A protein has these predicted regions:
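Active-site-adjacent structural elements that line small-molecule/cofactor binding pockets in enzymes
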Residues: 1-132
Length: 132
């Protein structure tokens, strides 16, 4: 299947992309962000929310935000359990991951520094302990 579009701001000739996604109906659509309209967009358009954790932010805690997001989904007539929560920016710390699980996070994405192999390999080994 080929796509082509010629508009005022976007213009491309016929093209194709492979491999095609195996997820049906499509790969999960996650939205990051923490702004005032984020939850509106997550509830309307997305399969989940991906807040960047591990940095200070004012206002409600992550657990409180997850409750607010799920409540907003329910108010909009959407199954709150259909929203997946992915925490981005964590270090591989068992206590921190446990707190994320308690808060309602479904998946965590660890961050690794851009350093030499000798510095990063032990961190990858720590991350591997969380994969089951």
């Amino acid at each position: 299947e080929e796509a082509e579009f010629h508009g005022d701001h976007v213009n491309f000739d016929k093209m194709w992309a492979y491999p095609k996604p195996v997820q049906r109906p499509h790969p999960p659509i996650l939205m990051g962000g923490d702004g005032p309209r984020t939850f509106d967009r997550v509830v309307e358009y997305c399969d989940g929310w991906m807040p960047i954790t591990g940095r200070a932010s004012a206002g409600p805690s992550l657990a409180e935000k997850i409750v607010l997001l799920k409540r907003q989904a329910e108010d909009a007539g959407r199954d709150p359990d259909s929203l997946n929560i992915t925490s981005f920016g964590l270090r591989p710390d068992p206590d921190l991951v446990g707190r994320m699980q308690e808060a309602g996070v479904d998946r965590v994405i660890f961050t690794l520094p851009s350093e030499e192999r000798e510095a990063v390999t032990p961190l990858i080994d720590k991350c591997a302990k969380f994969i089951s």
